[in-house]
Amino acid sequence: MAELGVHQSALQTDLALCVNRYRLFSPGWYVCVLAKVQLSPEESEVPGLVAMVNYGRKKQCEVRDEVFHGAPNFVLDVFYSEDDHDFLRRRDRFCNFGVHEYLVAFDAEPVGLLWHRLDAGCYRLVEPDEDGIIRSHALPNLWLPLKAVQDRDWWAVLGCIERGVSRRANFA
């Protein structure tokens, strides 16, 4: 991953804090920032954040030699624009290797957000439900309120995450 600017890094840190808050309520998950993901023997990436199920039928990858091997369940990256070559390459690569959800934030005012979900081998963009919340399938009960994320209202985001994790998870 290319070196991040200060504003990109701050946004990534805030989003990582939110995903890690979810992890604290959800045993059995690895959540790491800037960890290497070996997608195949020839191809690897270092995303902004990786989340993977650590056991059971939803587990998609292994941790060996301090590296994720295989496609994690969830990846998050921060870029400046949708035209960024690294974003386009990563999106295609993560889709091809089976990353279930790829969340991309764009450092702007308001924050831009593209939530990709794997569906029949292709990514489709996820829209919020009627209540304005995007509900992850890769990370059961991770709820992110779109407007609060766009406005960088991290307290509202954390409150929504806590509401989500208080529900019975659907691991189907």
Which residue ranges define each predicted feature?
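Gly/Pro/Ser/Thr-rich low-complexity, intrinsically disordered segments predominantly at protein N-termini
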Residues: 1-172
